[in-house]
Amino acid sequence: MENILKLIARYPLVEDLVALKETTWFNPGATSLAQGLPYVGLTEQDVNAAHDRLARFAPYLAKAFPQTAAAGGIIESDVVAIPAMQKRLEKEYGQTIDGEMLLKKDSHLAISGSIKARGGIYEVLTHAEKLALEAGLLTTDDDYSVLLSPEFKQFFSQYSIAVGSTGNLGLSIGIMSACIGFKVTVHMSADARAWKKAKLRSHGVTVVEYEDDYGVAVEQGRKAAQSDPNCFFIDDENSRTLFLGYAVAGQRLKAQFAQQGRVVDASHPLFVYLPCGVGGGPGGVAFGLKLAFGDNVHCFFAEPTHSPCMLLGVYTGLHDAISVQDIGIDNLTAADGLAVGRASGFVGRAMERLLDGLYTLDDQTMYDMLGWLAQEEGIRLEPSALAGMAGPQRICASVAYQQRHGFSQTQLGNATHLIWATGGGMVPEDEMEQYLAKGR
């Protein structure tokens, strides 16, 4: 307790986190892209290489997963306007939201129905390519749909993949690995939903269940993989490859906006709200967005009040040296995908200058917004995916934030607010009914 009091004396906002209050923190250390980029340790060239790799795999994905064929084997999600939801939020919160609200439907991405279809699938493909190239079975000029042949399945079956997950990352890595032919083990934390485990098992994936939280599942997965030289551990806390898989979203969104005739520039700012668990997904996407839109995009991470690991780490500067449990928070939340007690130190340090802020919201708030979105727009998401939905109202309510960035009323009126919906497209009907019943 004494340590917590000392921490609060130095970092007053910790008091609100401990009290589980919905909290908004605008980052005083935010810099321009030019100043912040060197700290990421990755470049636009790295993201372009990831983009090219996904293009090489597109013919394979189009055949392996027919639902991706129409898009030519590219796994990408729609951007839709949600005007009725915007009005509903204004009414519920008594707060005008200037500009236009859009929803990025990663919740409905092909193959695994979440944002993790970006990073998780990309890292599995990267590993498969590396093994096949090293074995001389493939060149980068080949048509990668040859990977569907029995010879390749046989080759990949000598190797295994392991990952620790609260659910969605395990789902994307498990399904993709099993399809390639890898043996795959997913170490699931206590928060993981039963249907996600069942789906993985139906694909022939080994699921190891823990009574503990995410950190323990990752640690156990890492340990199990160390004893097997043919086992590759996908490390959600530290993986640059996962991060780059997410970062590809930036250029893709830029192309989608161009197609829609949507302008993003100094007088038409873009605000993006990303749900955050350990940080890899939102961190990678935010990095890609910064490369695509520069200083005209403003990124915010959203976390449950019971799992504010990234806000705690970045705000105190302690990063992965502190967990929410250290300040007496239980890390128990209905937003199972965000139930992480200790943030990625890699992501926190890489992105702390490129984030405009972080905020927390209550589980009940997520349930309420889940219900409103279903009623107003007919779109159904899982609780985690609603974390970003509270963002626009927080920004529009903060005159201090607007003044610090010198936003005029005209700029705010021209703004685009993009809510990144991270998952929910594959939630079973009965489970979704339970979610909807919890909204007010």
UniProtKB/Swiss-Prot annotation:
Annotated EC: 4.3.1.18
GO BP annotation list: D-serine catabolic process; isoleucine biosynthetic process
Keyword annotations from UniProtKB, A to Z: Lyase, Pyridoxal phosphate
Listed PROSITE patterns: DEHYDRATASE_SER_THR
Residues with the N6-(pyridoxal phosphate)lysine modification: 116
Enzyme class: lyase
Domain of life from the UniProt record: Bacteria
Pfam families on file: PALP
One MF term in the entry's GO annotations: hydro-lyase activity
InterPro entries xref list: D_Ser_am_lyase (IPR011780), Ser/Thr_Dehydratase (IPR050147), Ser/Thr_deHydtase_PyrdxlP-BS (IPR000634), TrpB-like_PALP (IPR001926), TrpB-like_PALP_sf (IPR036052)
SUPFAM superfamilies per record: Tryptophan synthase beta subunit-like PLP-dependent enzymes
Reactions catalysed: D-serine = pyruvate + NH4(+)
Cofactor(s) required, per the database record: pyridoxal 5'-phosphate
Signal peptide: none
Family as reported in the entry's similarity comment: Belongs to the serine/threonine dehydratase family. DsdA subfamily.
NCBIfam families: D_Ser_am_lyase, PRK02991.1
Subunit structure: Monomer.
HAMAP family referenced in this protein's UniProt entry, alphabetically: D_Ser_dehydrat (MF_01030)
Protein name (Swiss-Prot/TrEMBL): D-serine dehydratase
